[in-house]
C-alpha cells in the first residue's frame, strides 16, 4: 500500500509539471504579417540635463527601426528637463555701506528667456536658515535684489522661488545667506593674507609651487609677538633675581 501511495503521489506531481507545458507551448508561433512589417520609433541616445538643479535641457536622438533592425529617419530633439528644483544655499559676507546684488538669473533661465518665469522672494531676517516657517514675504518681483548701501538690518536668508509663467510650476528654489558686518569687526581683505606665490596665481600667472614663501603677517601681529617675547624674558629674569635675593636673606638669617 505504501508503495502504491508513493507511486500515485509521484505520478501526480509529474502530471502537474508536464500538463502546463503541453497546454501553453505551441508548436509554431505565428506572427501577423502587419506586425512583421511594423516600424517603431526608438530613443537610441540621450544626454544628461544641462544643469544639476532648476530647469535645463537635454538632447534625445530618435530613430525609426524596422524588422530588419536598420535605423532610419533619425532626429535629434531638445527637451526640457528638471533633475532637482532645490538648489541649496549661497553664502555672502559684506561690509556695511557696500553695494551688493542677489540674483536668481542663471544660464538655464537665460536659455528660456527671463519673461517665461515668475520670481518670488521671501526673507528670514537676521537668521541663516532653510526653515520655511521663519520666512516672510519680501517685496521684489524681479530676478534680483539690490542693496545700494547694505546695512546690518539687511542680514538674513533670502529665498528666491522661480516658477514658469505658463503653468506656475515651481522649477527652482535658491537660498542666499547674507551677513552684513561693520568694517571694524573683521578684516575681509582676502588678498592680504595670501602668500606671494598665491597672489601671483590669483592674478593668473604660473608659479613654481616647489619654492615655498611665508605668508604675509600684518605689522601689528609682529609687534604683539615681540612684546610677548620681551615680557616673557623680563619675567624669567625677574623671577631668577627674586629667588637669589630670597636665598641670600635666608642664609643671613641662619647665620
From Swiss-Prot:
Residues carrying sugar: 45
Subcellular location: Cell membrane
Domain of life, source organism: Eukaryota
Tissue specificity field: Highly expressed in sperm (at protein level).
Membrane side Cytoplasmic: residue ranges: 248-255
Sequence intervals crossing the membrane: 227-247
GO molecular function: protein-macromolecule adaptor activity
Keyword Glycoprotein: yes
GO CC annotations on file: plasma membrane
Keywords: Cell membrane, Disulfide bond, Glycoprotein, Immunoglobulin domain, Membrane, Signal, Transmembrane, Transmembrane helix
Cystine residue pairs: 104-160
Flavoprotein recorded as keyword: no
Extracellular side: 31-226
Main localisation: membrane
Signal peptide: 1-30
Topology with respect to the bilayer: Single-pass type I membrane protein
Role this protein plays: Essential fertilization factor required for male fertility. Part of a conserved trimeric sperm complex with the essential fertilization factors IZUMO1 and SPACA6 which bridges sperm and oocyte membranes during fertilization by binding to IZUMO1R/JUNO on the oocyte.
Assembly, per entry: Forms a complex with IZUMO1 and SPACA6 on spermatocyte cell membrane required for fertilization.
Protein name, UniProt field: Transmembrane protein 81
Organism for this UniProt entry: Homo sapiens
